[in-house]
Amino acid sequence: MFIGIVSLFPEMFRAITDYGVTGRAVKKGLLNIQSWSPRDFAHDRHRTVDDRPYGGGPGMLMMVQPLRDAIHAAKAAAGEGAKVIYLSPQGRKLDQAGVSELATNQKLILVCGRYEGVDERVIQAEIDEEWSIGDYVLSGGELPAMTLIDSVARFIPGVLGHEASAIEDSFADGLLDCPHYTRPEVLEGMEVPPVLLSGNHAEIRRWRLKQSLGRTWLRRPELLENLALTEEQARLLAEFKTEHAQQQHKHDGMA
């Protein structure tokens, strides 16, 4: 998969290219990340990349010419079929369904804004889609771009150590992930659930699904509103709610 980065701070992406799952993907040749800085396309001796906005107001905008030239260079390197994305608070909010959708593209170009943003005409002329990672303000598009890259890279065959990992991630089926445990079996009096030590894979699968449904109900109930639960899922969720109510009643009685 090819991912081009247009950013004033390409060095930030070493966190993606040199470390962790994405770093291994780059080393294995599964992920090709290249970057272009608008500063390298500035024509003046100060390498200016910002300009004043028409109409006044605080802050500056990214200068049109260096930014467009950097985008054009990224497009030329990517070749036909590259989707150009601008990381923007005005964009579609990234979720697991969106990640899965973006992962079907073999070529992405991510444009990272700075200052107060970019000229609207650049967005209209050069950008295919705008994406956001949440309703809050950041200093630039680099961190959202890294988030997008990390999440999309998990779908590339061979990137994860276990192919089931991406399938079982939180949100992969619209639910939060279930609790996980490793050694020791007892930690400060807290024991690993016996079912996970039983070796009964059918019961383990059932327990994990119940916990996943229950955790979603407790922490992100709005996610369940968009799901058509199977008969098994509905039954397990009902069991979880009953067990949770019993635990709460027991806890309240001890208080």
From Swiss-Prot:
| InterPro entries for the chain | Alpha/beta_knot_MTases, tRNA_m1G_MeTrfase_C_sf, tRNA_m1G_MeTrfase_TrmD, tRNA_m1G_MTases_N, tRNA_MeTrfase_TRMD/TRM10
Enzyme Commission no: 2.1.1.228
Q: Which Pfam families does the record associate with it?
A: tRNA_m1G_MT
- Keyword set includes Cytoplasm: yes
Key words, A-Z: Cytoplasm, Methyltransferase, S-adenosyl-L-methionine, Transferase, tRNA processing
Q: What residues bind S-adenosyl-L-methionine, as annotated?
A: G113, I133, G134, D135, Y136, V137, L138
One annotated GO biological process = tRNA N1-guanine methylation
Q: Which GO terms describe its molecular function?
A: tRNA (guanine(37)-N1)-methyltransferase activity
What's any one GO cellular component for it? cytosol
Reaction equation(s) it catalyzes: guanosine(37) in tRNA + S-adenosyl-L-methionine = N(1)-methylguanosine(37) in tRNA + S-adenosyl-L-homocysteine + H(+)
Q: Which CDD domains match?
A: TrmD-like
Tell me where it resides.
Cytoplasm
Q: What is its main location?
A: cytoplasm
Give the matching HAMAP family. Answer: TrmD
Role noted for this protein: Specifically methylates guanosine-37 in various tRNAs.
Indicate the family of this protein. Belongs to the RNA methyltransferase TrmD family.
Q: Spell out the subunit comment.
A: Homodimer.
Q: What is this protein called?
A: tRNA (guanine-N(1)-)-methyltransferase
Gene responsible for this protein: trmD
